[in-house]
Amino acid sequence: MLEEAGEVLESVLKASCLPLSFLLFVPAVLLLLGPPPAAEAAHESTVYRMQQYELGGQPYGTRSAVLNTEARTVEADVLSRRCVMMRLVDFSYEQYQKALRQSAGAVVIILPRSISSVPQDVVKQFMEIEPEMLAMETIVPVYFAVEDDELLSIYEQTRAASASQGSASAAEVLLHTATANGFQMVTSGAQSKAIHDWLIPSVEGRLTGLGGEDLPTVVIVAHYDSFGVAPWLSHGADSNGSGVSVLLELARLFSRLYTYRRTHAGYNLLFFASGGGKFNYQGTKRWLEDNLDHTDSSLLQDNVAFVLCLDTLGRGNSLHLHVSKPPKEGTLQHAFLRELEMVVASQFPEVKFSMVHKKINLAEDILAWEHERFAIRRLPAFTISHLESHRDSLRNSIMDRRSQVDTKALTQEYQDHCGGFDEGHLQPNREGSTCRSADLHGSDADPGGAARISDGLAEQSAQAAQLIDKDSTFLSTLEYYMGRYLKDVKQHHVKADKRDPEFVFYDQLKQVMNAYRVKPAIFDLLLAVCIAAYLGVAYVAVQNFGLLYRMIQRLSLKTKQQ
């Protein structure tokens, strides 16, 4: 029997019998069509999830973190239960809504390696879209990834496959669907969970004035946390890294001036770097409650001259003083306003200065500016910013990077504030103890110090409130700077109430996404049909081996006769 089988095989090869040759080579063809080894098919990328939080009982952002779907681009006709990949340069809010309307399984937005290389019109458009993305709560997981060569290659292959399906015929689409390679996107993390015991830290420090016990107090405040559509990408170099930089440089300068009797003014200076500024100024709110409601001895309870809030000072040729109530003539706030206006006009004539009056709208869920927290507690306060409106998209964008901050503008803001604190505001408490503007601009002043501090803080990781706890590197750096220049430096912490929390943060904000090269599900069905057909033909051939043998003999004889 084996001899006959060998003779049959030899005859098949000599006669080039197509049906049996096909049967013999089908397994090899199927192996070649199969997916490559798993080790060569996987690619890892770090992805950053969109914001997920609750503020005042209102949820924002995405509610899901699990990603395990096949990749497509917006060019595909069907996006349902697919991971829709988009590049920033091609991104639009209409495309984003299209993906959500079609019940996409996930959305991954690919960002360029360097934001500075992106055209400004694209940056501006995306900054305007960010608030709309957060306002529209969705169950679809939304991630951001920084491009690399492998990820771009995956995107281009997926885009080509998606585009070809839209322009091909039905038969071509079916064939392409059955044979094309795809990419399965899978994240490594679990579903997001609420963090109920998160602490928002703030840092306080002070300089004591020269004189009696009832000295007036000037409070200088800046919130340090950043905000954007993705917490891990929110660096906040301008909003509000620039404000914190100016606060620290003012602390350094006044610490030197308060060292000498001649320049030691009769004012207490209280510096406060607040946390949770982007979440309705939670750090400032709790700090005021602790100092005004829960203690009998506090600088905020005694004689507050005014509160100066620093917010977004690192760009542009404009400077705006935001107030809830215009200061009255004869008050220290009015004198500060006039002196600041004079300094800007005389030393920086190219800078546009104005006062912006906006009443506090208690019906809004989120306060516009930080000084409104103080104004609600009847403390005279105002905010200085280069932004004319609190609705400016720059305040809440992942596009706010160090490369976007103008070092010259930051230095000007610092010098403006130094000029504002002249002898009209830091009056001598006794003869010979006057702090004059000449001293503020003297040898101890360092106009470039604010820019250097900004560079130092920018080297830290993202400064979103969800990422900064009491042991974070950024907070340690901030506390170190304040400890060098100020006295009684200490932290304050805010923890949400368990029964009725004002804010709730969620985890799983940073994950690893694996891209696996896969065949579509229909390929398994097609493969099963081919294997079944192959086995069926083989079975019939074996059952009718005698007939097959005689047929091959006749073919062989004809070949020899020819």
UniProtKB/Swiss-Prot annotation:
Ranges facing Extracellular side: 42-521
Membrane topology term: Single-pass type I membrane protein
Job description of the protein: Component of the multi-pass translocon (MPT) complex that mediates insertion of multi-pass membrane proteins into the lipid bilayer of membranes. The MPT complex takes over after the SEC61 complex: following membrane insertion of the first few transmembrane segments of proteins by the SEC61 complex, the MPT complex occludes the lateral gate of the SEC61 complex to promote insertion of subsequent transmembrane regions. May antagonize Nodal signaling and subsequent organization of axial structures during mesodermal patterning, via its interaction with NOMO.
Complexes and interactors: Component of the multi-pass translocon (MPT) complex.
Residue ranges, Cytoplasmic side: 543-562
Transmembrane segments: 522-542
GO cellular component terms listed in the entry, alphabetical order: endoplasmic reticulum membrane; multi-pass translocon complex
Keyword field: Endoplasmic reticulum, Glycoprotein, Membrane, Signal, Transmembrane, Transmembrane helix
Region (Disordered): 420-447
Membership in a protein family: Belongs to the nicastrin family.
Any GO BP annotation: multi-pass transmembrane protein insertion into ER membrane
Any matching Pfam family: Peptidase_M28
GO MF annotations in UniProt: ribosome binding
Primary localization: endoplasmic reticulum
InterPro entries membership: Nicalin, Peptidase_M28
The organism of origin for this protein: Gallus gallus (Chicken)
Residues annotated as signal peptide: 1-41
Protein name in the entry: BOS complex subunit NCLN
Keyword Repressor in annotation: no
Locations listed in the record: Endoplasmic reticulum membrane
Positions glycosylated per UniProt: N240
